[in-house]
Swiss-Prot record:
Biased composition (Acidic residues): 603-614
Name this polypeptide is given: Chaperone protein DnaK
Protein family: Belongs to the heat shock protein 70 family.
Database matches in InterPro entries: ATPase_NBD, Chaperone_DnaK, Heat_shock_70_CS, HSP70_C_sf, HSP70_peptide-bd_sf, Hsp_70_fam
PANTHER family from the UniProt entry: HEAT SHOCK PROTEIN 70KDA
UniProt xrefs under SUPFAM superfamilies: Actin-like ATPase domain (SSF53067), Heat shock protein 70kD (HSP70), C-terminal subdomain (SSF100934), Heat shock protein 70kD (HSP70), peptide-binding domain (SSF100920)
Disulfide bonds: none
HAMAP family reported in the protein's UniProt record: DnaK
Feature: compositional bias, Low complexity: 581-602
Length: 614
């Protein structure tokens, strides 16, 4: 059995962690960083880039670089690359595959299982899609865990067995959650959770982009939003400025050659953004965090004085305005001993350990973030499971028909808090037919909701009279069938083989270039010691390598390198022989000097002996 890891699949960055000796370790990626940008790019040569390498080339490959795809997961969004449509699951799977690969390189073992985290306020379709992304990446997804719960698990287990109430304020790159949890004696229980799936650091970045666009338009009369490359450069500069403003009072944004004017003259952008101005243009975003915060306190039925610890999660909580607001709302200083970028992945690794039996005496009790119900007469939302119900859970309720002799019922499943069903999120629908003819109100239809530990919903309907039953595992328009998942897994595996082959080919080319260069350099440095015919042969072999490198035939390159290697061995042999001959000539010269009558042999006199003679 392979190893299990914990993965924080983030909007802007992702992290992977593993249990070693009972302790969670965050794994550095192949570039040496502990966080991996959640960016995927399709290079023009067919290579798929993931992480920092994808982020680095975004400006020159805007249309084929995908970032923040987590904001689309669970929807029917697709992107068309080379006449092929990619779903958010497939793009997310690329990031997961890189994390898996980097973990395997670190561990020296296969990674087969994973606990993947999601925002607490993710609805069913988003959770299902995240699980599918894991499957496409070749992972057995042990559990989908809420990010604040994972963070509290990592934080709480370090605090021992004393009971405590923890408020987790999680502001990531694309989503926001706030959760209240009770931890004690190995039990982590979520009391309430709320959030906003469309609020995160990306929105703060966008405000800086908008500010820069307005400034540039006012000064230069040019709208930068019409230039995709310029917008990408603005995005990258905005993110850097936001980070800089967390520790400085101002940030200078200088982008030379950002675009050209109508006469093709280059234009430059140079602006200074103060922290005060930044907070002013993003104040409404900050205010949006207050409603979920107040909702959680209300739902949990607690006063703020009963909260023992406040934990900040997500890189966006590093903004001073965010931590100041949290302190203002809670009356407590947020805990500084937690790395907001890594704590979620650490908690996920601990949960993986719990599920694999490697961590004992820990129980995680999560909740469903939104109410679940069905549409009943008049379009009313009839809730079967209220929000903040501990999962896994199962609930049944009996309904009846609205018309005489109604042969079937349509079960429409919704998720949300609004009173009318149409105002909530439709998760799916199915039909229960074969109902025995009867006056309205007589048939008894039992509807059962079942939520598993991943927060994924199944619904069944049963006619009590006939025993006829129908079940649906919620899978809306964005859901993938098992056949589609299997196809995507094979596609991902094929790409992995292609990528491996491409890497090997590039390594062969690099080695060939290096061998040719080093051989020529060696000949130049030792030219006077090497025979002309050998130099000619080696030069021809090196030329053959250079010629092969111009083509795409990897076997031809390998063959040319092999031939050059054989000829190069003769270089070493010839140089050795030349040095030996030179040494012999020097020895002969020394011998001649020994027989010269003009050379006087010196007598060595021991100083002590000389003194004795005196």
């Amino acid at each position: 059995m392979g190893r299990a890891v914990g993965i924080d699949l983030g909007t802007t960055n992702s992290v992977v962690s593993v249990l070693e000796g009972g302790e969670a370790t965050v794994i550095a990626n192949s570039e040496g960083s502990r966080t991996t940008p959640s960016v995927v790019a399709f290079a023009k040569n067919g290579e798929i880039l993931v992480g920092q390498s994808a982020k680095n080339q975004a400006v020159t490959n805007v249309d084929r670089t995908i970032r923040s795809v987590k904001r689309h997961i669970g929807t029917d969004w697709t992107i068309d690359i080379d006449d092929k449509k990619y779903t958010p699951q497939e793009i997310s799977a690329r990031t997961l595959m890189k994390l898996k690969r980097d973990a395997e390189a670190y561990l020296g073992e296969d990674v087969t299982d994973a606990v993947i985290t999601v925002p607490a306020y993710f609805e069913d379709s988003q959770r299902q899609a995240t699980k599918e992304a894991g499957q496409i990446a070749g992972l057995n997804v042990l559990r989908i865990v809420n990010e604040p719960t994972a963070a509290a698990l990592a934080y709480g287990l370090e605090k021992g067995e004393q009971e405590q109430t923890i408020l987790v304020f999680d502001l990531g790159g694309g989503t926001f959650d706030v959760s209240l949890l009770e931890i004690g004696d190995g039990v982590v229980e979520v009391m309430a959770t709320a959030g906003d799936n469309a609020l995160g650091g990306d929105d703060w970045d966008q405000r800086i982009v908008d500010w820069l666009v307005d400034k540039f338009k006012a000064s230069q009369g040019v709208d930068l939003t019409k230039d995709k490359r310029a917008v990408q450069r603005l995005r990258e500069a905005a993110e850097k400025a936001k980070i800089e403003l967390s520790s400085s009072q101002s940030a200078n944004i200088n982008l030379p050659y950002i675009t050209v004017d109508s006469e093709k003259n280059p234009l430059f952008l140079d602006e200074t953004l103060s922290r005060t101005e930044f907070q002013k243009i993003t104040q409404d975003l900050l205010d949006r965090t207050k409603t979920p915060f107040n909702q959680v306190i209300k739902d949990a039925g607690l006063s703020l004085s009963e909260v023992d610890h406040v934990v900040l999660v997500g890189g966006s909580t590093r903004m001073p305005a965010v931590s100041d607001l949290v302190k203002e709302m809670t009356g407590k200083d947020p805990n500084k001993g937690v790395n907001p970028d890594e704590v979620v992945a650490v908690g996920a690794a601990l949960q993986a350990g719990v599920l694999r039996g490697e961590v004992k005496d820990v129980l995680l009790l999560d909740v469903t973030p939104l109410s679940l119900g069905i549409e009943t007469k008049g379009g009313v939302m009839t809730k079967l499971i209220e929000r903040n119900t501990t999962i896994p859970t199962k609930k049944s309720e009996t309904f009846t028909t609205a018309d005489d002799n109604q042969p079937s019922v349509q079960i429409q499943v919704y998720q949300g808090e609004r009173e009318m069903a149409s105002a909530n999120k439709l998760l799916g629908s199915f039909e229960l037919g074969g109902i025995a003819p009867a006056p309205r109100g007589v048939p008894q239809i039992e509807v059962t909701f079942d939520i598993d530990a991943n927060g994924i919903v199944s619904v069944s309907a049963k006619d009590k009279a006939t025993g006829k039953e129908n079940t649906i595992k919620i899978q809306d328009g964005s859901g993938l069938s098992q056949e589609e998942i299997d196809r995507m897994v094979k596609d991902a595996e094929a790409h992995a083989e292609e990528d491996k082959k491409r890497r090997e080919e590039q390594e062969t080319r690099n080695q060939a270039e290096s061998t040719s260069y080093q051989t020529r350099k060696f000949m130049d440095e030792n030219s006077d010691k090497l025979p002309e015919d050998l130099k000619t042969r080696v030069t021809e072999a090196a030329d053959a390598v250079d010629e092969a490198l111009k083509g795409d035939d990897i076997e031809a390159i390998k063959s040319a390198v092999e031939k050059l290697g054989t000829e190069s061995q003769e270089l070493g042999k010839a140089l050795y022989e030349a040095q030996a001959a030179e040494a012999g000539a020097e020895g002969a010269a020394a011998g001649e000097a020994a027989g010269d009558p003009n050379v006087v042999d010196a007598e060595v006199v021991d100083e002590d002996d000389e003194n004795k003679e005196k």
